[in-house]
């Protein structure tokens, strides 16, 4: 059996028998989500929770002052940042910003893969956000939120983490980029669903992880469409031959201004603005 097939077999066996070690949501993200679900929470109390993690606090200030939110006046305190982002939106944004803590490894090759995966995920997220912001400009009442899409895009390949962690245990055999890419392509979605369920994430996030690589579309635009668009833009969509058909449909639905949408000035500006949240 090749090392490639051996890794897939090992992962599938562990997944079937609930033996695969799943990543846990960072503690600060758990605290923020619990606080956000408290009906009596207020902006000041939420800021106090976020302040428990200085790195996250700095991230939230950066988000609040990012070009993507389009505010010229800078905020200087967490209270101001939470107020600007919004109490409801903070739950998803804070969780999204805390996820980077999971992309670590003691093995240099695996760490390189995790760092690359995180960079790719941010790129996908920024493109998806850019397209949704464009779509919202002509569809004011669409029930889709940028904070939800941000988190959905950042976890759409979260199933890759246990694959990389497993490879870390057998670096001489599995820490080869080609093997890892094949395993991530074939198993990331299935593992990702299990992870998101274990974290108590809503079905809306699970659906994106399950469906982004598929072809199912509908007249009702959803978060999956924007993650899929971003994957197409990054040449990461697995069904390349179906891309023209999907792009024509998304063009007709108004998700993008033209087929080569990343060359559109507004999309390009939205993308650059979104990147300021992660720089």
Model-derived features: positions:
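Conserved alpha-helical "signature site"
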Residues: 1-155, 162-169, 175-177, 183, ...
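Terminal helices and disordered tails flanking the catalytic cores of nucleotide-processing hydrolases
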Residues: 5-14, 254-279
């Amino acid at each position: 059996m090749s090392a490639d097939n051996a890794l897939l077999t090992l992962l599938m066996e562990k997944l079937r028998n609930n033996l695969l070690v799943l990543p846990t949501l960072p503690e600060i993200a758990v605290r923020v989500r619990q606080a956000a679900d408290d009906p009596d929470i207020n902006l000041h109390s939420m800021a106090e929770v976020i302040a428990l993690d200085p790195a996250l606090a700095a991230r939230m200030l950066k988000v609040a002052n990012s070009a993507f939110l389009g505010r010229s006046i800078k905020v200087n305190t967490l209270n101001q940042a939470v107020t600007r982002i919004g109490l409801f939106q903070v739950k998803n944004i804070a969780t999204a910003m805390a996820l980077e803590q999971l992309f670590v490894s003691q093995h240099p090759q695996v760490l390189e893969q995790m760092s690359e995966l995180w960079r790719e995920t941010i790129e996908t997220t920024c493109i998806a956000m850019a397209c949704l912001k464009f779509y919202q400009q002509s569809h004011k009442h669409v029930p889709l939120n940028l904070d939800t899409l941000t988190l959905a895009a950042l976890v759409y390949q979260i199933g890759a983490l246990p694959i990389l962690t497993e490879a870390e245990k057998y670096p001489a055999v599995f820490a080869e980029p080609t093997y890892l890419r094949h395993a991530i392509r074939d198993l990331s979605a299935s593992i990702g669903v299990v992870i998101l369920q274990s974290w108590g994430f809503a079905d809306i996030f699970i659906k994106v992880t399950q469906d982004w690589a598929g072809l199912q579309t509908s007249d009702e635009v959803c978060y999956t469409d924007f993650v899929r668009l971003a994957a197409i833009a990054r040449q990461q969509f697995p069904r390349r031959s179906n891309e023209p058909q999907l792009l024509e449909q998304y063009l007709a639905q108004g998700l993008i201004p033209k087929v080569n949408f990343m060359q559109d000035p507004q999309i390009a500006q939205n993308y650059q603005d979104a990147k300021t949240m992660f720089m």
